[in-house]
Curated annotation (Swiss-Prot):
This is Large ribosomal subunit protein bL31. It comes from the Bacteria. Zn(2+) binds at residues 16, 18, 38, 41. The lineage of its organism: Bacteria, Pseudomonadati, Pseudomonadota, Betaproteobacteria, Neisseriales. NCBIfam families: L31 (TIGR00105), PRK00019.1 (NF000612), PRK00528.1 (NF001809). One of its GO terms (biological process) is translation. Binds the 23S rRNA. Binds 1 zinc ion per subunit. The gene is rpmE. Keywords: Metal-binding, Ribonucleoprotein, Ribosomal protein, RNA-binding, rRNA-binding, Zinc. Its cofactor is Zn(2+). Belongs to the bacterial ribosomal protein bL31 family. Type A subfamily.
Length: 71
């Protein structure tokens, strides 16, 4: 094997927006990294579904296409 061709592999502190923190190893040049969703707050892992309504888009969709889904 050749020497000095591989990137540095060091610990990386990952912080989620929910407050969960964990340490992993990475070749990323940073010491810390922030993410929006982790396994502690992702709906797939928690079993809780969240609907994020941005500027009433869900209501607008329901007004426009709500009659298609009524039986």
């Amino acid at each position: 094997m050749k020497n000095d061709i591989h990137p540095n592999y060091k610990e990386l502190s990952v912080t989620c927006s929910c407050g969960q923190q964990f340490v992993t190893k990475s070749t990323m040049g940073k010491d810390a990294f922030s993410i929006e969703v982790c396994s502690s707050c992702h709906p797939f892992y928690t079993g809780k579904q969240k609907i994020v309504d941005t500027a009433g888009r869900v209501d607008k969709f329901n007004q426009k296409f709500g009659s298609f889904f009524k039986r």
